[in-house]
C-alpha cells in the first residue's frame, strides 16, 4: 500500500482539488463512491492568517472516512509557515498540500500558483517553511512547467523531495495549456523515476484503466 509521510493511502484514486468544484458536498459524494482521499479547494494562506471567515469555511472536513488534505497557496514562506498550523488546527487535516500549479491569471499575476515554477528557489523556500511549521506531512501540487520551453517538473519535484515533501502531485500540462489538450503522462513518468517519494498523476484521467502510471 502506498503511504504519504507514513499515512496509508487506502486506494489508488484521490480526488484532486479544484476551486469552485471540490467543495464539502462534492468531496463527500466522491468519498462515498470510493475515493481514497480528497483535498480541499485551494485556500489562501494570507487570508487564513488574517482569519477570514469565508476562508475558514473552506476547511471543513467531510464526515466520510478517508485521507483529507488542505491545499494552501501563497508566495511568502513566512505567511505559509504561519498558515500551516492554523490550517491543521481548524480542519483536522491529515496532510497539507502546496499549490504550485494553479494556472489562472489572477493567481499567477500575484506570483502564486504556477508562477512559482518560474522561481524554483522561492518554491523551495516555501516548501521548507511549510515542512518545518507543519506537524503533518506536506505534499506539493505542480505542473509540467510554465510552457513547453520551460519544462521543470522533474527539477521542482527533486527540490520538493530535498526540502522534505512527502509526495508530489504532477499535472501533466503546462501553464500555457491551462486545461486544454491531453496531459503529458511521459513527464509524470520522468518525475516518478527521478524521486523516491510517491508521485500522484493528475490530468486526463477518464476511466479506471488510466489510474496507474508505471
Task: Annotate the PLM regions.
Residues 1-214:
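Flavin-dependent oxidoreductase catalytic cores
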Amino acid at each position: 500500500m502506498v503511504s504519504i509521510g507514513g499515512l496509508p493511502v487506502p486506494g489508488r484514486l484521490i480526488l484532486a482539488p479544484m476551486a469552485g468544484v471540490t467543495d464539502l458536498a462534492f468531496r463527500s459524494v466522491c468519498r462515498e463512491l470510493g475515493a481514497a482521499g480528497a483535498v480541499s479547494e485551494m485556500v489562501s494562506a494570507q487570508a487564513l492568517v488574517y482569519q477570514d471567515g469565508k476562508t475558514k469555511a473552506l476547511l471543513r472536513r467531510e464526515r466520510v472516512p478517508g485521507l483529507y488534505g488542505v491545499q494552501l497557496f501563497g508566495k511568502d514562506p513566512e505567511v505559509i509557515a504561519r498558515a500551516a498550523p492554523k490550517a491543521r488546527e481548524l480542519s483536522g487535516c491529515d496532510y497539507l498540500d502546496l499549490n504550485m500549479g494553479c494556472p489562472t491569471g489572477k493567481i499567477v499575476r500575484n506570483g502564486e500558483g504556477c508562477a512559482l515554477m518560474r522561481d524554483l528557489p522561492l518554491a523551495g523556500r516555501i516548501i521548507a517553511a511549510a515542512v518545518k511549521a507543519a506537524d503533518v506531512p506536506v505534499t506539493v501540487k505542480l505542473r509540467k512547467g510554465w510552457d513547453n520551453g520551460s519544462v521543470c517538473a522533474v527539477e521542482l519535484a527533486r527540490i520538493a523531495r530535498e526540502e522534505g515533501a512527502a509526495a508530489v502531485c504532477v499535472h501533466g500540462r503546462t501553464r500555457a495549456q491551462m486545461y486544454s489538450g491531453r496531459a503529458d503522462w511521459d513527464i509524470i513518468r520522468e518525475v516518478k523515476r527521478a524521486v523516491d517519494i510517491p508521485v500522484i498523476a493528475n490530468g486526463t484521467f477518464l476511466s479506471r484503466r488510466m489510474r496507474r502510471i508505471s
